[in-house]
A protein has these predicted regions:
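Bacterial N-terminal signal peptides that target proteins for export
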Residues: 2-12
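Bacterial N-terminal signal peptides
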Residues: 11-22
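Mature N-terminal segment immediately following signal peptide/propeptide cleavage
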Residues: 27-69, 80
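Repeat-blade elements of multi-bladed beta-propeller folds
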Residues: 32-36, 71-94, 120-148, 199-228, ...
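Conserved oxyanion/phosphate-binding beta-strand-loop segments in alpha/beta enzyme cores
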Residues: 46, 51, 282-286, 438-442
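Extracytoplasmic/lumenal domain signature
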Residues: 53-67, 95-119, 135-136, 149-197, ...
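PEST-like low-complexity, intrinsically disordered acidic/proline/serine-rich tracts
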Residues: 86, 359, 412-470
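A surface-exposed, glycine/aromatic-enriched loop/edge motif typical of exported proteins
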Residues: 235, 392-423
Length: 470
């Protein structure tokens, strides 16, 4: 398995060996500087040496075996920077620099072991590294499963002198590290982490460095595995890229006096949480904006204990990178109970629109088969997004929003909702089997509500299409 999975990383590296001179991304360079290739998260290149005609002629130049670093899932997108390839691997989230010509390991860095890192549910989910050039020196930034931010010299892998603050744990470097838990404002033990009865937080996506500001998202316990309704909010943190000093914190669950606080009834804002940003971030450096795609509030399929729309759950938030002030936001799903969290970074592009000319846009692809499109400066939808009635819940104590936002354009890219007419009918026998297989399930529209055991319909469960996996 290790060989197969690491090959996904390494074949990309091998292609970069041959064609790196033609890699051009949105920053106007020949490099791949961020997880998405560029700040706009286009994951695209203007390179034209690889074509449909010559693709079959590509050969593997080398392979790098990540098994020695505990690589299992292989979720990382390598970065190509200043002639080196940077990636992360394994449950320990090693940071590794490779020679793209030979595949040889130049250096590696591993954070010392801690219980808070060991029990991280997203330990092997590392997606990549952050990068910035600070005062002429390349710096690699990494967020560990234990939720530490480390700054490393891109040439040597040595923690940056003068960055961060000492961590009171044996084995940690005395410089180069920031304990991110310290800035969330909850009691915790530096070694053990947050008490499990308080909540859980970690990270899988790398930080994004915009105009010398490190912006840190986070990940909570997976909503479909949550065992408690108590949790901590996944607040967005930002740090000075030179010193590691905290610059600002944005509360993803609004506190008293903040915009949106009234969307949390039952005082749930005090003791529940999530609304994290496990998906990557994107940014518009010219306009000092970072775009945050958020997760649902705690527990994916039931929210009776948190009545209200629950801002900023299942939203896109545009923040000023300098201050953390909210420029605008849009909530895709009110009081989310379908696992319809935003699963990927917003994509930035400029659209030529009739009567409007070139419009700076941001697009959020979602699990519910819609692409939400906005003016990225003002937050105005580029096409109408209308509130339409949706079914109510029959689950005791659950009060869903009576309406949900519906995108009118672009058209959905996949089926939304499911009826008996959508079932397979290749032959009469296949159709009969399909109907029988789903007889105990409640079919319905896109926002078909979850149901509970022993419900009055006699159905075993409700079906969602698309489901929580998109």
């Amino acid at each position: 398995m290790h060989t197969l999975i690491t090959r996904r990383i390494l074949l990309l590296a091998a292609v970069l060996v041959v064609f790196s001179s033609s890699l051009v991304v949105a920053q106007g360079t020949t490099e791949w500087l961020t997880l998405g290739g560029d700040y706009a998260h286009t994951r695209s290149t203007l390179a034209d040496e690889i074509t449909a005609e010559n693709f079959a002629e590509l050969d593997v130049a080398w392979e790098w075996d990540g098994a020695s670093f505990g690589a299992v899932s292989g979720r990382s997108t390598p970065s190509l920077i200043d002639g080196k390839l940077y990636t992360v691997a394994g449950n320990k989230r090693y940071v590794i620099a490779l020679d793209p010509k030979t595949g040889e390991t130049i250096w590696s860095y591993r954070e010392p072991d801690t219980p808070r890192g060991e029990y991280s549910m997203r330990a092997d989910y590392g997606k990549g590294v952050g990068y910035a050039k600070i005062d002429g020196r390349g710096v690699i930034y990494i967020i560990s499963p234990g939720f530490f931010l480390t700054a490393l010299d891109a040439e040597t892998g040595v923690p940056i002198e003068g960055f961060g603050r000492p961590v009171p744990i044996d084995g940690f470097p005395q410089t180069g590290v920031v304990d991110l838990l310290a800035d969330l404002g909850h009691p915790y033990d530096p070694y053990e982490g947050l008490p499990l009865e308080t909540g859980y937080i970690t990270s899988s996506s790398p930080p994004l460095v915009v105009n010398d500001v490190i912006i840190v998202g986070n990940s909570a316990e997976q909503g479909y595995h949550q065992s408690r309704i108590e949790n901590v909010p996944g607040d967005i943190l930002a740090y000075d890229a030179r010193t590691g000093a905290l610059k600002w914190k944005f509360n993803v669950i609004p506190q008293p006096g903040e915009y949106g606080h009234e969307t949390w009834e039952n005082d749930a804002w005090e003791w529940t949480g999530d609304v994290s940003s496990w998906a990557p971030l994107s940014a518009d450096p010219e306009n000092n904006l970072v775009f945050i795609p958020t997760n649902s509030a705690t527990i994916d399929y039931y929210g009776g204990f948190r009545p209200g729309d629950n801002l900023y759950g299942a939203s896109i938030i545009a923040l000023d990178t300098r201050t953390g002030e909210r420029a605008w936001h849009f909530q895709m799903v009110h009081h989310e109970v379908w696992n319809f969290d935003n699963p990927t970074a917003p994509v930035l592009l400029d659209l030529n629109m009739p009567g409007r000319g070139s419009v700076p846009a941001v697009m959020q692809v979602t699990k519910q088969s819609w692409v939400y499109a906005f003016d990225r400066i003002t937050g105005e939808p580029l096409w109408p997004i209308v509130e339409r009635p949706v079914p109510a819940s029959i689950v005791p104590g659950e009060v869903l929003s009576p309406t949900q936002p519906h995108v009118t354009k672009p058209a959905p890219y996949d089926i939304q909702g499911i009826t008996i007419d959508d079932l397979a009918d290749f032959t009469p026998e296949i159709r009969r089997q399909a109907i029988e297989a789903l007889a105990d399930y409640q079919m319905g529209p896109l926002f078909n509500p979850p149901i509970h055991a022993g419900n009055s319909t006699g159905k075993f469960a409700a079906m969602n299409c698309p489901g929580g996996g998109g």
